[in-house]
């Protein structure tokens, strides 16, 4: 949906815009001649404070995040049951990823698909896949009761 709204705005020659539909975001052009700024929330925070700020450079960026930190239930054993299913086990994913964010240069559809796939893969395979395919990826992971933010190589090129 966000991609279609963007394409319509471009068709109408409305080049400067930020669109957010359900956490899928497109920024295009500028915000009164300044970069658009999009904050990525800390998944463990109850506030809306951002952990990372993404700014565009008067260009198009599609941003999609995926995570299991809000939309889950617990079973009788206290284990998380999430809405993302591991395609290999056909069970709810179980990994150390709290949040996945993908920034794509051309497509919100790709950003959304990659963020969901990386969430299901787990952190090591996701980061290897992103680096091998030149994809801008940020993972917020929890390990040993610590929160770490890790980035793919492309993230540093695209998100400055």
Label for each model-derived stretch:
Residues 1-160:
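Mature catalytic core of soluble alpha/beta enzymes
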């Amino acid at each position: 949906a966000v991609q279609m709204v963007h394409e319509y705005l471009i068709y109408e020659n409305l080049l400067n815009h930020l669109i957010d539909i359900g956490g899928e975001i497109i920024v295009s052009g500028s915000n009164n001649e300044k970069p658009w700024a999009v904050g990525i929330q800390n998944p463990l925070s109850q506030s809306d404070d951002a952990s990372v700020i993404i700014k565009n450079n008067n260009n198009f960026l599609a941003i999609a995040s995926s995570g299991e930190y809000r939309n889950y239930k617990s079973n009788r054993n206290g284990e998380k049951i999430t809405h993302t299913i591991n395609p290999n086990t056909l069970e709810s994913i179980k990994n150390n990823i709290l949040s996945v964010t993908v920034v794509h240069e051309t497509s919100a559809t790709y950003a959304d698909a990659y963020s969901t796939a990386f969430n299901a893969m787990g952190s090591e395979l996701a980061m290897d896949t992103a680096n091998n395919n030149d994809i801008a990826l940020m993972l917020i992971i929890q390990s040993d009761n610590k929160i770490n933010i890790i980035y793919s190589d492309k993230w540093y090129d695209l998100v400055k």
